């Protein structure tokens, strides 16, 4: 018996279940809110929470969008790109956006709280700039990034809007050896370097 579950496969598998809602809180306060919401719904609901606790970044710069399904923050004035992400990796995206902003590249970060289903039509007015990055720690095939990119691009093309350059950055289809988070990240980075 070898442990293989890294939390990278669950979204892809769970989102294939008809009628499911999936939440990905990134703080203890949001975890409580998500659990309360899950209990109040008369539907199948999954709440995922990463091991390792609450990631550290400045949440005060984020404001609610799309009702309460997501939050957004602009790092700099007139963002030239939008990053959509969720969960623990939001901290990494926020730190990267701070660094880019300090160098003159403004970025909008959108963090999904409810990661499936996502209302692509409601997200359209929140997109900024000429590029869209969908960033997740999950498996790419069937993941939030892949599904949301398809929905957003379809909605934009039907509406006749500008279609941004779009990149889904997720774990390519492979098994990741079991280990703590830093070991897993190191393994993935090494594999990506060999693949490029």
PLM ranges: what are they?
Residues 107-126:
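Generic long, charged, amphipathic alpha-helical segments
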Residues 48-50, 85, 135-136, 170:
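Short beta-strand segments
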Residues 1-4, 186-193:
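Conserved small/polar residues in nucleotide/adenosyl-binding loops
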Residues 2-82, 91:
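Conserved thiamine diphosphate
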Residues 5-9, 36-41, 61-66, 95-102, ...:
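Short, solvent-exposed amphipathic alpha-helical segments in soluble enzyme
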């Amino acid at each position: 018996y070898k442990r293989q579950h890294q939390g990278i496969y669950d979204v892809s598998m769970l989102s294939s279940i008809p009628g499911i809602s999936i939440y990905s809180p990134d703080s203890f306060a949001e975890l409580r809110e998500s659990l309360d919401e899950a209990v109040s719904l008369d539907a199948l609901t999954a709440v995922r929470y990463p091991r390792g606790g609450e990631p550290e970044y400045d949440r005060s710069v984020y404001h609610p969008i799309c009702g309460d399904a997501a939050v957004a923050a602009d790092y700099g004035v007139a963002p030239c790109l939008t990053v959509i992400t969720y969960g623990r990796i939001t901290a990494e995206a926020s730190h990267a956006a701070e660094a880019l902003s300090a160098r003159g590249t403004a970025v909008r970060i959108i963090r999904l709280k409810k990661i499936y289903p996502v209302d692509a039509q409601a997200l359209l007015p929140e997109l900024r700039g000429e590029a869209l990055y969908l960033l997740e720690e999950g498996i790419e095939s069937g993941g939030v990034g892949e599904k949301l990119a398809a929905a957003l691009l379809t909605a934009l093309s039907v509406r006749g809007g500008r279609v941004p350059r779009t990149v889904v950055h997720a774990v390519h289809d492979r098994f990741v050896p079991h280990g703590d988070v830093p070991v897993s990240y190191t393994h993935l980075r090494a594999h990506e370097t060999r693949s490029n």
